[in-house]
């Protein structure tokens, strides 16, 4: 990196606000995906003014710039694919304002998702998007990826809960999108910005909608001896006119991994479980819970139980939300995918996932948002074995290709990033992709902000078939 740029960044942020030594950069080569990319430096702004100056400096020196929250993303979105500066929002983590009466809050992008809900729980409110990483992921990252979570089924994704944004464009221009009003005139630039994966600008403030906590929550655990029976239950519940707050599925392999780690009370001999939640007014929630239990039993659930209290409910959800961590304890590496399919295609798709695993001799666990058909196959491999790594990537691609074949999508909530850019042509024509690039160029004309993301590049998929080793982490010769 140019020494003059480094000097200017240190003068702006102080020596403790800039990292550039190889050992210090190691953490920032990674996120939650299998991708690796090294930045030239990492900076830590304290406020919007710092971000404006960082962007202006990067623009002046023609250096790529990438925003980063907690680094929990699963598509390489927060990695510096082409080097340059990573802007970490770890120090911009304040809840600036809470308006209980109007059910909204204004926050900096580094606020942790779960921390906001904890801060407003006393008022009977919460922030509805709930990714499994909600105890670590940031609201700024949620905005960039348009994150969802188990309760997306009833409450929607992040864009449904964002009222307004303050953002810095790649030119250093500060813009305000949306408003606290129910609707605002003009083009829906806010809607375009949310989910743009950091390619339009760096978000510095977010006004979010807060949602009332439901009067009653009924959480059911249904246990099955057949995966097909579990998947058919999901379609039947929605066919009965019930939209659960959440409807999660876990297969037998994942159940055993989770139970050894969390001890949530999942039966080790089950082929699958469904974790279903209905909420709302007491009479409605209790009635819907009875219908859901009946449907589960109609489809041969071995047993159905309702959580007796909040403690039991929290334990069940702890099991679900720690699934990825549980897998990490028993495998050197794992690759989490994120495809979407119609609910009616769940049985066939899970069978196909099993076939792909056997083809490559790889174990694949399944834990996912069954209610909206958002799959998260977890492919186990050892990254020290390059052939296993290549096979894991090929297996992941084949799973996503099948999702598209049956009428689904290449991603539901993890984003495209640098992981799936090569798969975009499965869904979009050249004309479609060109139109998207033209929209990006309105905000980011020089493509200096988060370059190499979303759109296919000349590097193609070969870039991740041989995972580079960090010179810091590499063993001595």
List where the protein language model places each region.
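N-terminal flexible segment immediately upstream of the FAD-binding catalytic core
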Residues: 1-56, 73-103, 132, 252-263, ...
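Alpha-helix capping/hinge segments and adjacent helical runs
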Residues: 14-15, 404-416, 440-441, 445-452
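C-terminal substrate-recognition/cap domain of FAD-linked oxidoreductases
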Residues: 19-22, 28, 208, 212, ...
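A glycine- and small-aliphatic-rich helix-loop capping segment at beta-alpha/alpha-beta transitions
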Residues: 75-93, 121-125, 148-159, 206-212, ...
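FAD-binding subdomain of flavoenzyme oxidoreductases
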Residues: 94-250, 465-477
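Activity-critical C-terminal alpha-helical subdomain
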Residues: 173, 421-477
């Amino acid at each position: 990196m140019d020494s003059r740029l480094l000097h200017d960044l240190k003068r702006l942020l102080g020596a403790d606000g800039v990292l550039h030594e190889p050992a210090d950069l190691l953490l920032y080569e990674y996120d939650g995906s299998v991708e690796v990319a090294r930045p030239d430096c990492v900076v830590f702004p304290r406020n919007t003014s710092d971000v404006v100056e960082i962007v202006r400096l990067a623009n002046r020196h023609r250096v790529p710039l990438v925003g980063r929250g907690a680094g929990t993303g699963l598509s390489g979105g927060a990695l510096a694919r082409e080097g340059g500066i990573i802007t970490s929002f770890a120090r911009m983590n304040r809840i600036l304002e809470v308006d209980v009466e109007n059910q909204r809050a204004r926050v900096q992008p580094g606020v942790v998702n779960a921390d906001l809900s904890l801060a407003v729980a006393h008022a009977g409110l919460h922030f509805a998007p709930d990714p499994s990483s909600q105890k670590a992921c940031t609201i700024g990252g949620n905005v960039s990826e348009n994150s969802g979570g188990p309760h997306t089924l009833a409450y929607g994704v992040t864009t449904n809960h964002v009222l307004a944004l303050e953002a810095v464009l790649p030119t250093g221009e500060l813009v305000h999108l949306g408003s606290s009003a129910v609707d605002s005139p003009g083009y829906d630039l806010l809607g375009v910005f949310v989910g743009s994966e950091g390619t339009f600008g760096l978000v510095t403030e977010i006004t979010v909608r807060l949602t009332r906590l439901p009067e009653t929550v009924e959480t059911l655990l249904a246990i099955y001896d057949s995966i097909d029976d579990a998947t058919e239950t999901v379609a039947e519940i929605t066919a009965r006119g019930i939209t659960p707050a959440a409807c999660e599925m876990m297969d037998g392999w994942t159940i055993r991994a989770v139970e050894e780690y969390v001890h949530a009370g999942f039966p080790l001999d089950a082929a699958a479980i469904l974790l279903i939640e209905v909420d709302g007014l007491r009479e409605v929630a209790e009635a819907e819970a009875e219908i859901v239990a009946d449907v589960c039993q109609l489809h041969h659930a071995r047993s159905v139980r309702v959580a007796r209290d909040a403690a039991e409910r929290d334990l069940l959800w702890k099991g679900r939300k720690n699934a990825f961590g549980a897998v990490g304890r028993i495998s050197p590496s794992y690759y989490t995918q994120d495809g979407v399919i119609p609910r009616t295609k769940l049985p066939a798709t899970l069978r196909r996932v099993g076939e792909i695993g056997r083809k490559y001799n790889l174990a694949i666990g399944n834990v996912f948002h069954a209610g909206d058909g958002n799959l998260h196959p977890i492919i186990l491999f050892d990254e020290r074995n390059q052939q296993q790594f290549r096979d894991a990537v090929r297996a992941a691609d084949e799973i996503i290709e099948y999702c598209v074949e049956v009428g689904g999508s290449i991603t539901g909530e993890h984003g495209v990033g640098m992981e799936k850019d090569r798969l975009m042509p499965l869904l979009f024509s050249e004309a479609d992709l060109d139109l998207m690039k033209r929209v990006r160029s309105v905000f980011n004309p020089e493509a200096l902000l988060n370059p190499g993301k979303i759109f296919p590049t000349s590097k193609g998929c070969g870039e991740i078939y041989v995972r580079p080793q960090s010179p810091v982490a590499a063993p001595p010769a």
